[in-house]
């Protein structure tokens, strides 16, 4: 038996011996996959109760997506009752294990629902030469809905081996597979085909596992046609789930997805446009399947996808030009601590609100209306980042205030709450194109300086763990107060009287 990355795998001979056992036996086990505490799941259920009310009333966006899945699935011949109970189970399991609507990562339950809806849409538009039968549709439905089911993952990106472990361990999923006459090994082989990027060691490992699963499913090695058929069905799923979010939404949604993906991978914000262009370039290498899928959905979704690609390219070109201007000193950035005793120029206020409105996701601690009002609150600390040559041109800002005025993320308890000695830094926002040129460093430095001047002892907030560790390694007096896995959006605290205010720090 070989061991790799904390996982124990059976040898090939052991696998062959195991193939005679019941389909529900595991071919490998994950020693880290301990059951979630009942108290943890109860806590999640209680916290999610208001959302469940909205979901059951149909006002949550997940409920709308569920209804669209049921509609297209019914048209393809799937039982509404069967789909409904499986979707409900998936939402419940993802949510109570921390991967629900409040999870700050790309691979959350909404992505699973988007992937399922788009995959079924693409399947419904296949021509006669590529038509799927009802069993194929059932495989696609289940595989799309659970292809990222890895609640104990260490990173945002799931591990297909662990996904298989959790699916095989889930009694309800196994029963739904069996009652429809499906084979769990074929379903798992399709999910392994979603491994990304599908090249090099990742592809060879997935193919090896898929071949074993095909053998276990009773498909002999000689039956290359059937194996290729299910391999391609998994490929169809893989491309569909990667295209889904970028085809179903506009560029605002595409940017949100890119930011979530960047956060999960620990990228600096300055890499978002560049890496997004690379992502779509790699996808175009699968042109055969990509064209097949895009030609199977409505013109609206196809155009959404193509326009989003084009806009990412435009944003990257613009970003390159901005960086060139900054490095040639044609333009320069200056931070400004806004005086709360002086009314802010309406143009500056509008610029700040525009930057804020471009953002989405659970990092935003106020809604748009409350945010606008908070800019003029006497306790607000606001630092703007401007283009020196155009004084009123704001391209970023850092904003915060007394800790007591904020609701923290579930699970965060700050011992300083009520002591009025702590400032909460909401976040730092910079327009696309200006990241990576020390603007964020200047905003943060001036925000910390202003907080110290006002008599505060600490600054807290949420930041990706990799960023926090890098700052700690540089000697910053920064403390990790509350960890959050797998999204790694951790709560930190900085002790201001120990902070180095050297601008080059």
Predicted feature descriptions by range:
Residues 115, 135-153, 163, 188-195:
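His-Asp-centered metal-binding catalytic motifs of divalent-metal-dependent phosphohydrolases/nucleases
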Residues 390-427:
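Conserved acyl-donor/pantetheine-binding loop and adjacent beta-alpha core of acyl/acetyltransferases
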Residues 451-465:
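Conserved GNAT acetyl-CoA-binding A-motif
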Residues 327-370, 384-386, 393:
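Short amphipathic alpha-helix that is part of the acyltransferase structural core
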Residues 9-74, 106, 118-134, 146, ...:
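Divalent metal-dependent phosphate-bond-processing catalytic cores, especially two-metal-ion Mg2+/Mn2+ enzymes
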Residues 427-430, 436-449:
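Conserved acetyl-CoA-binding loop-helix of GNAT-fold acetyltransferases
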Residues 112, 119, 160-216:
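Histidine- and acidic-residue-rich, metal-dependent catalytic cores
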Residues 88-116, 150:
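Active-site flanking loop/helix segments enriched in acidic
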